[in-house]
Amino acid sequence: MSSFLIVSILFFSALLSGIAVFFVKRDNTQLLKLVLSFSGAYLFAITVLHLIPEVYHSNQTPGEVIGLYILGGFLFQLVLEHFSQGIEHGHIHQSHEGHKHQAFPIAILISLCLHAFLEGFPLASGHRNELVFGIAIHHIPAAFALGSLLIGTRLNKQTIVLFIAVFAAMTPLGFITSKGISAGEIGNIAQYFDKIMAVVIGIFLHISTTILFESGSADHHTFNKKKMLAVLLGILVSMANFLFEGHDHSHHNHGPSEQTEETHNHDHHDHDHHDHEH
């Protein structure tokens, strides 16, 4: 997948979802909850199957240190959530909708943009195409919730769309920045890339588990068949990507191995032939 396509998918999925708040009833959240359940399960599975093994096998930083950075990312997201009020996992605060003019939620917007910026970092590390769709789907309810919150302020429609566009641009910006870091084009911080990735993994673990816990019924211990199907679908899609990539990887490795063995046999045959002539 080209960088242009990745940026387009990430930007327009969030932008269109945020703008949709002008046309869709905000009290109909059942579909959003199912989308959240799917994206939460997908993000969690991708993190466990791809991102965690990759950062531990980078061999640039000891595993114990990587674990500390993952915990740091988890705690960092806890702090961010205090300011964002959970909008990054689709919380729509309807209790404020009765007020015609709320104060502009600057802390929410900043923390949400920082969160979205960091989410773009794993996309530059290797083959992360499958993660693009997980993040894009995850941003649908987040952008919708942000749009709902901004509608309650004194801002006009054009300004609301502008702020939604700023949020939508954050993850593509994180992806481009991460790509520059991993290529060594931005400063001399490529050596810290695995630590940055570990922080993002901690954020993903917090976000995905929070989504899975909160996206069901009011009673979290009640079995919800639709939510369970959405969760299983998210895991199955990530597993399909994992198995497909694993097959390609093993097939790719098999080729050079056979080539090496063939070259070795050929050299051995030439050596015997030379001895026979001698």
Where are these regions (language model features)?
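Intrinsically disordered, metal-sensing/regulatory segments
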Residues: 1-278
